[in-house]
Structures are given as C-alpha cells and as structure tokens.
Amino acid sequence: MGPQHLRLVQLFCLLGAISTLPRAGALLCYEATASRFRAVAFHNWKWLLMRNMVCKLQEGCEETLVFIETGTARGVVGFKGCSSSSSYPAQISYLVSPPGVSIASYSRVCRSYLCNNLTNLEPFVKLKASTPKSITSASCSCPTCVGEHMKDCLPNFVTTNSCPLAASTCYSSTLKFQAGFLNTTFLLMGCAREHNQLLADFHHIGSIKVTEVLNILEKSQIVGAASSRQDPAWGVVLGLLFAFRD
C-alpha cells in the first residue's frame, strides 16, 4: 500500500508539472518596453532584450517602436510582447511627416521563436535618409522639447528653434502611450503645420494605445525664446500635465 501511495503522489506531481509547460504550438517571444528621451542618437541607442514570455496559443510576437523628433530633440517609445493580431511584415512609415515635429513608427507581428528581436534604430535611419531636408525660416520660432514633463521638459531644458516654412505654427501636447507594462506620459512641443492633434487618426500604433491632449500655448511662449522659458504661462501647461496623469 505504501509504494502504491507513493507512485500515486508521484503521478500527481508529474501531471502538475506537465500542466505548467507551454502547450504545443505556443511561441516564446521577447518581452520589453522602451521609453527614452535623453541623448537618443541613431547609432548609440540599444533596446536591451532581457526577458521573454510564453504566449497563448495562436498568438504571435509583436514589436512596435515609435521614433519622435522635434528640432534637435528625439524620443523613443516601444513595446515587445505577445499579440493576437495576424502576422504582418515590418512596416516603417511616418505617422506625422516632417518638416517640424515628426513621428515615425516601426511595427511587425511574427510567428517564430523569439522573432521580435529588433535592438536598434536602423529602420528609422533608412527612413530619414530618404526624406528631403526642409528650409527654416527665422521669422517664426517655437519652444521645443520631447520627454517627461518633470524630467526632460522642465522650462530650463526647453529650447527654442526656428521653424520650417511649411511648419510655422507652435504645437504642444501631452501624449500617453500604453501597452502591457508600457505606460508612458510625455510632453511634445515644437513647430507644426497647425496646432491640432497630430495623432488624431492613430488611436493605436501596433498594440500601443495612444492618447493625445493639446496643451494651451500663450503668445509669450510662441514669440520670445528667453521669455517663453520663464513665463507664468508655463503654469497652464504644467497644470494640464498634472491633470492628465493617472
């Protein structure tokens, strides 16, 4: 009776161990997020892939990366993980084209072992190389920044850049990107064609949910470079940012 009882316990343990194994056909994908707004350069940014995850049956591996430029400032926000979407090849394009504030995205869903393995900004290097350069106009300048409002976009860190002829309106918004463990809220300011929502037609970029709220810009922020950094109107922008936070 003793040996039979022991074998029964061993059987239950074995069944329990089997139940925790990934089912046949389940993919292993990289799991990662990216959110960086300082010192982002095309050839020195690396997406570290430290973790992976087992997906549900029929799910694929997704990687979506968003590259933002405004003046000389750059930001990168990204997501890697499992996705229920159908597979699609790498798609790289401008969601908001230059001149002025530009937002580009790279996204794909694949279905092979750890296939969501992009680690650099090479797709955006090629995209930018094919984009004609714009002509700037000294008659209009705007406060410029991209980053977290209490870190990268405090008034002392905001620069003022001359605007291109085709993008001579000052733009400011608070953006929130959410997907899996990604939950990033940041400020985006710069020159644009008009002060409307730039991502109004993009509620999702891949699996990343996008929320955009326009900020109020006072005339003093638009006209003067030095005065715009320290003007009380900054309180309006920061007030909206705090209201936007969860």
Curated annotation (Swiss-Prot):
Lipid attachment in record (GPI-anchor amidated alanine): A225
Pfam family, one: UPAR_LY6
Claim: Mitochondrion is one of the keywords in the record: no
Domain UPAR/Ly6: 142-223
Keywords from the UniProt entry: Cell membrane, Glycoprotein, GPI-anchor, Lipoprotein, Membrane, Repeat, Signal
Glycosylation sites: N117
Recorded GO CC terms: extracellular region; plasma membrane; plasma membrane raft; side of membrane
Origin superkingdom: Eukaryota
Signal sequence, renumbered to the chain: 1-26
Membrane topology type: Lipid-anchor; GPI-anchor
Protein location: Cell membrane
Proregion positions: 226-246
Protein's name in the database: Ly6/PLAUR domain-containing protein 4
Organism from which the protein derives: Homo sapiens (Human)
Gene expressing this chain: LYPD4
